[in-house]
A protein has these predicted regions:
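Contiguous beta-strand/loop segments that form the cofactor/metal-binding neighborhood of enzyme cores
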Residues: 1, 170-249, 276-297
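A short helix->loop->beta-strand "cap" motif at the edges of active sites that frequently abuts
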Residues: 29, 50, 87-89, 114-116, ...
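N-terminal Rossmann-like dinucleotide-binding module
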Residues: 1-47, 281, 290
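C-terminal helix-rich "cap/oligomerization" subdomain common to oxidoreductases
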Residues: 1, 67-72, 210, 288-327
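Short acidic low-complexity segments
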Residues: 51-63
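Short, conserved SAM-binding/catalytic segment
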Residues: 42-50, 107-111
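Predominantly a Rossmann-like dinucleotide-binding segment in NAD(P)-dependent oxidoreductases
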Residues: 117, 124-196, 323
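Beta-strand-loop-alpha-helix segment that lines the small-molecule cofactor/substrate pocket
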Residues: 62, 67, 73-74, 78-125
Length: 327
């Protein structure tokens, strides 16, 4: 995919580096912004034809980029994204998009006023297995959606500026919103802070939606092994996706319980391995962003999705600190 429209990446750290590499492979990398001179020097060696900048303002002044990816620390996203959008450029902002409701709402409003796309970096929505599950839900393969649970666990990177829920759960929240197409009516969260005061290392969050749909998200960066597991339960069957296992199996279980004469009766059935496309989520996300740099509306990971996810993060955090459900 070679595009005449170029993207500039703001923030060349670990995840920003992934964006840079992927955009270069797509033929769409135009520039890199980072305030670290050594980092820029390293990228100049790798990509000698790419323009380098120490400030976003300098990149904008050049006027050659149709879109920007913002992969800086979350607390800087708001200011950077506003500057980009107000220059008339489209922007993809990594998760968490912002750390408060007012900022993300203003970002959405700004995008609408200046008529640019504001996309959230909810990369899991572009995983082919997640899109396959969505297709199976929408085509009634598992019947009425009833319950979703997600475990995202590992002995991972411990943050000092945000808790584990803000760091890891945006992925899962975005998927829950994608599957349910509704906002949770009630959110209850609990967890433990063991390494730093008031920065939780593990959380369990319950989300209650309309039509008696329930879900839970369990995240931790203090876990002995990596586990990324998603279970989706319906009235006719269940789906499991093991993202942390080699070959990443997606399985359909045609079994469960039905009511027979008002008595729960177990229904056995086959377990089928479901095929899905072999594509990289980040590549698909960036291709989608580039395709929509013409200003056409985003159907996935759009501004509405960004606002919903941040709102759920905030309400879950409130429940976590107060020890009560939040409606």
């Amino acid at each position: 995919m070679q595009s005449s429209k170029k993207v500039c990446v703001v923030g060349a750290g670990h995840w920003g580096g992934n964006h840079i590499r992927t955009l270069y492979e797509l033929g769409s990398l135009g520039g890199i912004v980072d305030n670290n001179k050594q980092t820029l020097s390293d990228f100049k060696t790798k990509y000698p034809s790419i323009s380098l900048f120490q400030t976003v303002s300098d990149a904008i002044k050049l006027g050659k980029y149709s879109g920007y990816v913002v992969a800086t620390p979350a607390e800087t996203h708001y200011k950077i994204a506003l500057e980009i959008m107000n220059s008339g450029c489209h922007v993809l902002v990594e998760k968490p998009v912002t750390l408060n409701r007012k900022e993300v709402s203003h970002m959405k409003q700004t995008a609408e006023i200046v008529k640019v796309n504001f996309m959230a970096g909810h990369v899991l929505l572009f995983h082919p297995a997640i899109q396959k599950i969505k297709e199976m839900i929408d085509t009634n393969v598992i019947g009425n959606l009833q319950y979703i649970y997600s475990n995202r666990l590992n002995l991972g990177t411990v943050r000092m500026e945000e808790n584990v829920f803000w760091s890891l759960a945006p992925h899962d929240i975005s998927v829950f919103q994608y599957f349910t197409k509704s906002k949770p009516m009630k959110i209850t969260s609990t967890g433990g802070a063991f390494l730093q005061d008031n920065i939780h290392d593990t959380t369990l969050t319950i989300l209650e939606y309309e039509q008696n749909i329930k879900g839970h998200i369990f995240v931790s960066w203090l876990h002995p092994f990596k586990e990324h597991r998603l279970i989706v339960m319906g009235s006719k069957g269940m789906i499991s996706f093991e993202d942390s296992i080699e070959n990443k199996p997606l399985k359909l279980y045609s079994k469960g319980y039905t009511l027979k004469d008002a008595i729960p009766t177990k229904k056995d059935g086959p377990v089928d391995l479901i095929d899905y496309e072999n594509s990289m989520p980040l590549t698909e996300e960036l291709k989608y962003f580039i395709q929509h740099m013409d200003g056409s509306p985003l159907e996935i990971a759009n501004a509405d999705n960004a606002v919903e996810v941040v709102d759920i993060l905030i309400k879950a955090s409130e429940s976590l600190m107060k020890g009560v459900p939040i409606e």
